[in-house]
From Swiss-Prot:
Transport of potassium into the cell. Likely operates as a K(+):H(+) symporter. PANTHER family: LOW AFFINITY POTASSIUM TRANSPORT SYSTEM PROTEIN KUP, OSMOTIC STRESS POTASSIUM TRANSPORTER. The chain crosses the membrane at residues 30-50, 71-91, 117-137, 155-175, 183-203, 224-244, 265-285, 294-314, 363-383, 385-405, 410-430, 437-457. InterPro entries: K+_transporter, K_trans_C, K_trans_N, Kup. Its main location: membrane. It comes from Bradyrhizobium sp. (strain ORS 278). This is Probable potassium transport system protein Kup 2. Belongs to the HAK/KUP transporter (TC 2.A.72) family. Residues 1-20 are annotated as: Disordered. The keyword Coiled coil does not apply. It catalyses: K(+)(in) + H(+)(in) = K(+)(out) + H(+)(out).
Length: 640
């Protein structure tokens, strides 16, 4: 999953779950932009994918020509079936008001089911958690594989590969705070050059050994699998490296649109990748020793250093897309109630999606550097790659079935017939990758399991806290009726009480009445909702309900791709007749100090984890962009 990198939100959002036309930006610019952002990950897979697959097929020995043909055929048909058919043809139609990605798909699937929504949420949590594993491994593997090319110039560079990789990664994460808007405009042209170069470089070896073109025949892939038994199954796990990054096609749907992404894949990316894999295959057929690094050995000696430089830039771009994807996913998870509030900084005035999350950036940097130090080579790290991506693809296929059945209104048999072949293939790839758990596959599983535990704990704890608070709090309607009959002393101005439950009297309001024994002239019960759509039209942002001469309810709605700005949203309420002046308004927020209860509904360890997460949450004042000088916080203690 990737996010806003030089991507102008170019589409008029579709509303029918069949994402289509983008009209507000140049089609050519969008297509070029998608090449730079969407295809960075899958575009740098030739650096290691065929090498690892052939080494798996030959069990570390010299690969026979028929085995190389089988591997190349498997890679080509994986690109055709998994990427072209599943993602480019089918899933790009399953948009959530123009947006893609697993959490957007989860929200779309939730709207289609009355029962079983909790299962959909669980699938979304699994998919989102696995992505963080991918976000850690991709930068480490990509940059490491590019820098390793320098060893072909001279073995003397070998000791410097890991230190140089770490330096580049540290620099990459260090510049995140400044945003990528200025350099992102170059991502598309650079990646276009990359695809042209890797495609053209394949012609000489293909012309010398044109028999490699027979690998396009799927019978070579079938024959390889039938005659190699468990080795063929293990090889599938390495073949999958060629399609890692396919999720980005769907994740970046909202940034570029269906047509530009499809055009870039069919006319630039797929032909270049296919040619390069065929070229590498021809090289290894001619010289089995070329398996050491077939990608770089396709180039003449004079081009090695320029290609290492270009590959390094390409892998940095691929890593950048994954990093910003992690930011975007985190914001969506916060808005959907799967994670506590984190500090979110906007790095561009022009693009709302250009964000930076300091806490996520630090965690990713530490994790990525540790991986490089732990595995030390791209071959070792490749064993850890694939499990998180295959897991995400399996979940995507499952939720895609629900959308096709419930949202598109297909019959379950027709929906099953469409998705079943892809789900079977995804499960096969997942099974093959699970064989690599002990070799390094445990890394993304451990990372995913940890994030999954955090998401599940936060969602469950928040639900329990909400239910408990509702039982303890006073009904708002009863309180308003009492205050209208026996009004306390009034003070000038407007008081806004932020609450997650508009039916109950906010804790801050009750404490204000108890301690100050006064009531403002105007009192607003403010609730902030997250809609199951990426964005909300400004005309639908505010709902205003007058419940008494003194009290009114205001509901602000934000999409899960938006960062809530309360003062800006409240300004819209003026059009509804509410006179809002930030300088005469005080915002009352309650800050809860949580303590574990004897019987909370969660295990003791989960209680403590939820409390720790709650304490680490970013301040509501900052998150909702409320001026701190207008905020009054009231502390309360709650057992959970």
């Amino acid at each position: 999953m990737t996010a806003d990198i030089a991507a102008t939100p170019a589409e008029t959002p579709a509303t029918n779950g069949h994402g289509d036309a983008h009209s507000t930006a140049s089609f050519t610019a969008l297509t070029l932009g998608s090449i730079g952002v969407v295809y960075g990950d899958i575009g740098t897979s030739p650096l290691y994918a065929l090498r690892e697959a052939v080494m798996a097929a030959s069990s570390g020995g010299e690969a026979a020509p028929h085995a190389v043909m089988g591997v190349v055929s498997l890679i080509l048909w994986a690109l055709i079936v998994v990427v072209t058919l599943k993602y480019v043809v089918i899933l790009l139609r399953a948009d959530n008001h123009g947006e893609g990605g697993t959490l957007a798909l989860m929200a779309l699937a939730q709207r289609g089911v009355a029962r079983g929504a909790s299962i959909i949420v669980l699938l979304g949590i699994i998919s989102g958690a696995l992505f963080y594993g991918d976000a850690v491994i991709t930068p480490a593997l990509s940059v490491l594989s590019a820098i390793e090319g320098i060893k072909l110039v001279t073995a003397a560079f070998d000791p410097y590969v890991v230190p140089l990789t770490i330096i580049i990664l540290v620099m990459l994460f260090a510049v995140q705070v400044r945003g990528t808007a200025k350099v992102a405009a170059f991502f598309g042209p650079i990646m276009l050059i990359w695809f042209l170069v890797i495609g053209i470089a394949a012609f000489p070896p293909i012309l010398r050994h044109p028999e490699v073109l027979w690998a396009i025949n799927p019978l070579h892939a079938v024959s390889f699998m039938l005659h190699h038994g468990i080795i063929g199954f293990i090889t599938l796990g390495a073949v999958f490296l060629a399609v890692t990054g396919a999720e980005a096609l769907y994740a970046d749907l909202g940034h570029f649109g269906k047509r530009p992404i499809q055009t870039a894949w069919l006319f630039v990316v797929l032909p270049s990748l296919a040619l390069n894999y065929l070229g590498q295959g021809a090289l290894v057929i001619a010289d089995a020793k070329a398996i050491e690094n077939p990608f770089f050995l396709m180039f003449p000696d004079w081009a090695l250093i320029p290609m290492v430089a270009l590959a390094t830039v390409a892998t940095v771009i691929a890593s950048q897309a994954v990093i910003t994807g992690a930011y975007s996913l985190t914001r969506q998870a916060i808005q959907l109630g799967l994670l506590p509030r984190f500090e979110i900084r906007h790095t561009s005035e022009a693009h709302s999606g250009q964000i930076y999350i300091p806490r996520i950036n630090k965690l990713l940097l530490v994790s990525v550097v540790l991986l490089v130090l732990l595995f030390k080579s791209s071959s070792a790290l490749a064993s850890a790659y694939g499990i998180s991506v295959t897991g995400t693809m399996v979940v995507t296929a499952m939720m895609g079935f629900v959308v096709i059945w419930k949202v598109w209104r297909w019959s379950p048999i027709a929906a099953g017939a469409l998705i079943a072949p892809f789900l079977f293939l995804d499960l096969t790839f997942l099974s093959a990758n699970l064989l690599k758990v002990l070799e390094g596959g445990w890394v993304p599983l451990a990372l995913g399991g940890f994030v999954m535990t955090l998401m599940y704990t936060w969602r469950r704890g928040s639900r329990l806290l909400f239910d408990k608070s509702r039982k303890l709090e006073f009904p708002l309607a009863d309180l308003v009726a009492m205050l209208e009959k026996r009004p306390p002393q009034r003070v000038a101005g407007t008081a806004v009480f932020l609450t997650s439950d508009p039916l109950s009297a906010p804790t801050a309001l009750m404490h204000s009445l108890k301690h100050y024994k006064v009531l403002h002239e105007k009192n607003v019960i403010l609730t902030i909702e997250t809609a199951p759509t990426p964005r909300i039209d400004p005309s639908e942002r505010v709902r205003l309900e007058q419940i008494s001469p003194t009290f009114s309810k205001v509901t602000l709605r934000f999409g899960f791709m938006e960062s809530p700005n309360v003062p800006k949203a409240l300004a819209i309420a003026r059009k509804l007749g509410w006179q809002f002046d930030i300088m005469s308004t005080s915002f009352f927020l309650s800050r809860r100090a949580l303590k574990p209860a004897a019987h909370s509904g969660m295990p003791r360890w989960q209680d403590h984890l939820f409390i720790t997460m709650s304490r680490s949450a970013n301040d509501a004042t900052d998150y909702f962009q409320i001026p701190s000088g207008r905020v009054v916080e009231v502390g309360t203690q709650v057992t959970i």
